[in-house]
């Protein structure tokens, strides 16, 4: 991914 996002568990996803 490009922007920093958080999944339903609060983990950072890129």
Curated annotation (Swiss-Prot):
Secreted as UniProt keyword: yes
GO biological process annotation, one example: neuropeptide signaling pathway
Intracellular or extracellular location(s): Secreted
Keywords from the UniProt entry: Amidation, Neuropeptide, Secreted, Sulfation
GO annotation, cellular component aspect: extracellular region
Function text: Myotropic peptide.
Protein name: Neosulfakinin-2
